[in-house]
């Protein structure tokens, strides 16, 4: 009898331990603040991508009614500083994290970040409609950006320090040299368009998603205010090209860059769900419709543009 009682007690103890273990697992699961298709998160995004990311978030939230993605649009350098902020789940910029940034995330949050190029973007050059010149070689651009062009043109950016556009220009066009002190910093990409539209001797540099979609009413209104410049092609014998989707795809247009997300999650949360959406069929189609070039699913084809290039 005593032996049976001991066996019964051991059995009960075993059941209690199992119950506590299962309860603990369930509690851990329930403590997750979000899931791929449910919850709310905050992400930090390069301001030059605002039009296409606004559309991306709107479609995602429409497809997933239980989700809310708060987007903070900032200069790229500030987005990368946000990798150090616990509440920022994802950033979207034009480059991947570097080794220092990766190690900081691993050490601080015990998270191994994930990064993926989901689209290809370009920097569009715009001029005032009354400007006599709208075709520029790369040497012309370098001269303008350094203040030694034959005509006094004023470069205009969405900031002159921490933005992805300025970083690209300094790294890829000026090859490390400094911008002219005459460069003007607008408050945003829309501010660049507004400044150029009012200043005949201004030349602006903005992301193509602000002005590349001729089917978007807002961008059509921008196109009525400024003129898109043609830039000397990367390939000999082609002449001058504009930042159209076909030219971005082939890299015939020389000012091409990436759109990259960096995800900070140690479980499959809403950030994971949004990342999967951007790299999936619908997200890649949204990039294509915005006249960027999808980089994950490349079987959508490139949209033709019925515009004669000079």
Where are these regions (language model features)?
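N-terminal secretory signal peptides that target proteins for export/translocation
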Residues: 1-8
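Hydrophobic H-region at the start of alpha-helical membrane spans
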Residues: 11-14, 251-253
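Bacterial N-terminal signal peptides
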Residues: 13-23
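Exported/periplasmic ABC-transporter solute-binding proteins
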Residues: 25-64, 72, 84, 116-121, ...
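A short beta-strand-loop structural module common to alpha/beta enzyme folds
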Residues: 68-76
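Pocket-flanking alpha-helical
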Residues: 77-108
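Periplasmic N-terminal soluble interaction domains immediately after the signal peptide in Gram-negative
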Residues: 109-114
């Amino acid at each position: 009898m005593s032996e049976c009682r001991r066996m019964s007690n051991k059995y009960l103890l075993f059941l209690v331990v199992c119950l506590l273990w299962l309860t603990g697992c369930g509690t851990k699961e329930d403590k997750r603040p979000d899931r791929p298709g449910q919850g709310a998160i905050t992400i930090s995004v390069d301001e030059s991508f605002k039009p296409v990311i606004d559309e991306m978030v709107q479609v995602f939230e429409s497809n997933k009614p239980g989700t809310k993605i708060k987007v903070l649009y900032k200069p790229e350098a500030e987005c990368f500083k946000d990798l150090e902020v616990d509440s920022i789940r994802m950033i979207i910029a034009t480059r991947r994290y570097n080794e220092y940034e990766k190690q900081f995330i691993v050490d601080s949050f015990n998270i191994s970040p994930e990064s993926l190029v989901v689209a290809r973007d370009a920097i569009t050059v715009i001029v005032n409609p009354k400007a006599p010149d709208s075709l520029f070689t790369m040497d012309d651009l370098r001269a303008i950006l350094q203040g030694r062009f034959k005509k006094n043109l004023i470069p205009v950016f969405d900031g002159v320090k921490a933005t992805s556009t300025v970083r690209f220009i300094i790294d890829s066009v000026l090859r490390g040299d400094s911008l002219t002190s005459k460069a003007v910093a607008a408050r945003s990409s829309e501010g660049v368009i507004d400044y150029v539209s009012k200043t005949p001797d201004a030349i602006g540099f903005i992301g193509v998603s602000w002005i590349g979609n001729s089917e978007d009413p807002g961008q059509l209104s921008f196109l009525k205010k400024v003129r898109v410049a043609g830039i000397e092609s990367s390939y000999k014998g082609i002449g001058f090209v504009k930042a159209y989707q076909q030219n971005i795809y082939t890299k015939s247009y020389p000012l091409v860059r990436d759109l990259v997300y960096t995800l900070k999650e140690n479980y499959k949360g809403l950030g994971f769900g949004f990342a999967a959406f951007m790299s999936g069929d619908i997200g890649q189609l949204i990039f294509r419709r915005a006249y960027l070039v999808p980089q994950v699913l490349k079987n959508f084809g490139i949209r033709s543009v019925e515009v004669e290039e000079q």
